[in-house]
Amino acid sequence: MKLLLDEEISGKVAERLRDRGHDVMAAAEDPGLRGLSDPDLFDVAQRQGRALVTYNRADFEPIIREYAAMRRQHHGLVIVHPMRFPSWEFGRMAAALEGLLGRAELGRSFLIWLQESGA
């Protein structure tokens, strides 16, 4: 699984995961992705075959509902709760995402809330 981290998620999370061999991009690190609208960022993730990771449930859930209504598949959406994974605790978020990266059973068009690794 490949990931694209939404702009509000630290590039340090992506850096840690890349250091461990994972294919992860962060919008915060890419001037071409910073400032994109949520639908445009989701489209980029789909074109690149990436699940999108975001704190922004309110804007991205309607996008995946629209995909479902049109019977279009997507590469997944991972919602991060800001109270469980504050932005300054990027190591914990990276560890939880690494646990998720090995889960082939998720398949396509999944929506998942990020949990602590091992939980």
Regions found by a protein language model. Name each.
Residues 21-30:
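Short, basic, glycine/proline-bearing loop/turn elements
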Residues 30-34, 50:
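Short, surface-exposed loop/turn motifs that are enriched in glycine and acidic residues
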Residues 38, 44-46, 50-63:
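Acidic, metal-binding active-site segment of PIN/NYN-like and related structure-specific nucleases
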